Amino acid sequence: MAGQTQQNSVGELVEESSLSEYRRALSLVERLHRQLLDVVKDDLDRAGHDDLTPVQALLIFNIGDAEWSAGELKSRGFYLGSNVSYNLKKLHELGYVESGKSLHDKRQIRLRLTQAGSDLRRQLDTMFQRHAATLSPVGGVESPDLVSSNKTLTRLERFWADQIRFRL
């Protein structure tokens, strides 16, 4: 049934195969996100880190060696959840993140990892390095596959951001 079209809610014609592939991509992105959280959770559990959620661990990973404000973490795409303040407060209470006033703007709070946060980040980085080393021999995913996937996912991310920004 190639070439069949369907009319969307604004009267535009959408090729059925494009719609089907787009829906498949949506489902896959959602499943991959959940699977990543499960993989991180499994690694946390093995290391005895039952005090953290996978979202909090990824937030630690993304903070890295830099100092950030909560707003910067969100605006740069490192954290897209609505409860960034809750998670940062929790990480602060657990001793993974410390905060201090910005040198340039005393109203702004800057966040950085503590030694415990840096140790956890190294653990996560080791896991990601292990994944990267086995991606080809075990997963059958080569570097050019990742380059192509990353280009497509970046375009999709930009497309969705534009949907919100320009109310398309």
Segments (PLM) and residue ranges:
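DNA-binding alpha-helical recognition surfaces that contact promoter or target DNA
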Residues: 86
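Generic structural concept
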Residues: 30-33, 60, 64-67, 114, ...
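C-terminal regulatory/oligomerization modules of transcriptional regulators
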Residues: 1-18, 141-168
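N-terminal helix-turn-helix DNA-binding core of bacterial DNA-binding proteins
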Residues: 38-83
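Charged, amphipathic alpha-helical coiled-coil/dimerization segments
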Residues: 8-11, 89-148
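Alpha-helical linker/hinge and terminal dimerization helices associated
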Residues: 32, 36-39, 43, 77, ...
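Amphipathic, non-membrane alpha-helical segments in soluble helical-bundle scaffolds
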Residues: 19-30, 81, 121, 143-146
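N-terminal leader segment of winged-helix/HTH proteins
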Residues: 1-50
